[in-house]
């Protein structure tokens, strides 16, 4: 008996996610140490993340928008991958990018916890984390999947403790929907509301070079 299209799509998505993990696992790492954790979140996890993001409407309208979007996305075959890592450095680069003179000094600093991550954190660990996510997204694109990296869903998955022993996280969402769902999320807002919200959350995007005056 012939295999139904939906089953083929679901099975293909599962195999694609496995290849995305391989690509992320084998991606470049500063320091040559592979400390990034990777997990595929369940549909129930995604529902919880979507509701959490949507609840942040007053604090972060963009997170609320992405939560509403995820609620619609999971109605079709899709997957959400979570990437996480610890904040402390074992690299001993002593580059100062974290704001401390040495890695040891940063590692000894008092931990600060927020909704989105724990800090202070090694910038190279954060770069490694995003390189892994980018490698997974690149593999998804090569396999013909629709894909997008989400920081909003990442910090929501972190806040909800979807992965143990990590201090920062990012997510990669992939879909086999008929049309690309990731770059048409403005359907929930009018153009005026989008501009107002974007200027509120990212005021530096409305500024030019140093010395420019902010829009009133």
What are these regions (language model features)?
Residues 1-216:
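Acidic, surface-exposed loops and disordered segments
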């Amino acid at each position: 008996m012939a295999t139904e299209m939906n089953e083929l799509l679901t099975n293909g998505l599962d195999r694609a996610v496995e290849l995305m993990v391989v690509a992320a696992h084998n991606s470049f790492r500063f320091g040559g140490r592979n400390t990034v954790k990777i997990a595929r979140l369940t549909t129930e996890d995604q529902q919880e993340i979507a509701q959490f993001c949507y609840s942040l409407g007053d604090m972060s309208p963009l997170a609320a928008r992405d939560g509403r979007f995820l609620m619609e996305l999971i109605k079709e075959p899709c997957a959400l991958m979570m990437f996480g890592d610890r904040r402390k450095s074992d690299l001993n680069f002593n580059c100062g990018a974290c704001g401390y003179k040495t890695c040891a000094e940063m590692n000894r600093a008092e931990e600060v916890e927020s909704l989105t991550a724990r800090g202070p954190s090694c910038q190279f660990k954060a770069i490694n984390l995003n390189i892994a996510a980018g490698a997974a997204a690149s593999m998804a694109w090569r396999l013909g999947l629709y894909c997008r990296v989400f920081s909003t869903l990442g910090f929501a998955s972190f806040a909800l403790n979807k992965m143990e022993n990590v201090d920062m996280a990012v997510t990669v969402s992939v879909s086999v929907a008929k049309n690309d769902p990731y770059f048409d999320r403005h359907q929930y807002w009018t153009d005026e509301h989008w501009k107002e919200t974007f200027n509120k959350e990212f005021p530096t995007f409305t500024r030019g070079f140093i010395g420019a005056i902010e829009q009133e």
